[in-house]
C-alpha cells in the first residue's frame, strides 16, 4: 500500500484542546478505578516569531509531551488513604506526568491517555510555560 494512503487526509487538522473537546468528552472512555483520562497538551504549529514546525517535529512533540488536561477521573482516584491525604488534581487541571506514562488511545484529531492517579507528578497553570520539543 502506498505510504500516502496511510497519512491522514488533513495533516494540519484543528488541534484538540480543552475548549474544542468539550462536546466529545461524553463519548470518550470512562476511566475505571484509580485512573484518570487526560488530554495531552498539543503544541502550537508556529512559534511566536512565525516559524512553522514540520509535521515530524509536531508528531515527536505530541508523543513526548509531559502535560495534559484532566477530562475525567475514575471513582477510586485518590481514595487510597495510605498513598494520598488529598487529591493531587481535579477535573479541569493541567497536570504533568512522565514522558511515556499511561495508555495512549487515538481519537479523532489526536489522542487521550489513561493514567494511574499516582502517575501525576504535579499540576501546572499554563502548559505553554514548559518546553515540549525534543
Stretches found by the model and what they are:
Residues 2-134:
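Compact, glycine-rich, soluble single-domain proteins
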Amino acid at each position: 500500500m502506498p505510504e500516502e494512503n496511510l497519512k491522514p487526509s488533513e495533516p494540519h487538522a484543528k488541534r484538540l484542546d480543552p475548549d474544542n473537546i468539550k462536546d466529545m468528552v461524553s463519548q470518550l472512555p470512562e476511566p475505571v478505578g484509580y485512573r484518570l483520562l487526560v488530554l495531552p497538551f498539543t503544541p502550537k504549529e508556529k512559534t511566536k516569531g512565525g516559524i512553522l514546525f514540520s509535521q515530524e517535529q509536531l508528531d515527536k512533540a505530541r508523543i513526548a509531551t509531559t502535560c495534559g488536561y484532566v477530562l475525567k477521573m475514575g471513582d477510586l482516584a485518590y481514595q487510597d488513604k495510605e498513598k494520598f491525604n488529598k487529591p493531587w488534581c481535579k477535573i479541569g487541571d493541567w497536570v504533568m506526568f512522565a514522558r511515556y506514562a499511561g495508555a495512549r488511545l487515538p481519537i479523532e484529531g489526536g489522542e487521550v491517555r489513561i493514567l494511574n492517579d499516582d502517575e501525576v507528578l504535579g499540576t501546572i497553570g499554563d502548559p505553554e510555560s514548559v518546553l515540549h520539543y525534543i
